[in-house]
């Protein structure tokens, strides 16, 4: 499997096997983010969608998730909702 120097974990890990999003952002994620980090983002994204009850049809919700994704993957910021408690 192809390796990538992951920006989130700052180590060489398995790359995402496909470009996860279209466009320049998708290319950047594919070349700089590991599959491990992408899977962690998908889990975090699920928390955000559920806790904030996001409607993904709304452009505002999509933009919010895009901003959170960039913070999570490239700035290593993982903001969870105030009321969220892990089980």
Curated annotation (Swiss-Prot):
One of its GO terms (molecular function) is iron ion binding. The keyword Iron applies. The keyword Iron applies. Could be a mediator in iron transactions between iron acquisition and iron-requiring processes, such as synthesis and/or repair of Fe-S clusters in biosynthetic enzymes. GO terms for cellular component: cytosol. This is Probable Fe(2+)-trafficking protein. InterPro entries: Fe_traffick_prot_YggX, Fe_traffick_prot_YggX_sf. HAMAP family: Fe_traffic_YggX (MF_00686). SUPFAM superfamilies: YggX-like. One of its GO terms (biological process) is cellular response to oxidative stress. Belongs to the Fe(2+)-trafficking protein family. Keywords: Iron.
């Amino acid at each position: 499997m192809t390796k990538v120097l992951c920006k989130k974990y700052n180590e060489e890990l398995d790359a995402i096997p496909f470009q996860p999003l279209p466009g320049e952002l998708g290319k950047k994620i594919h070349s700089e983010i590991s599959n491990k980090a992408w899977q962690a983002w998908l889990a975090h994204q699920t928390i955000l969608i559920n806790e904030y009850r996001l409607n993904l049809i709304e452009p505002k919700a999509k933009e919010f998730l895009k901003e959170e994704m960039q913070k999570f993957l490239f700035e290593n910021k993982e903001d969870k909702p105030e009321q969220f408690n892990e089980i």
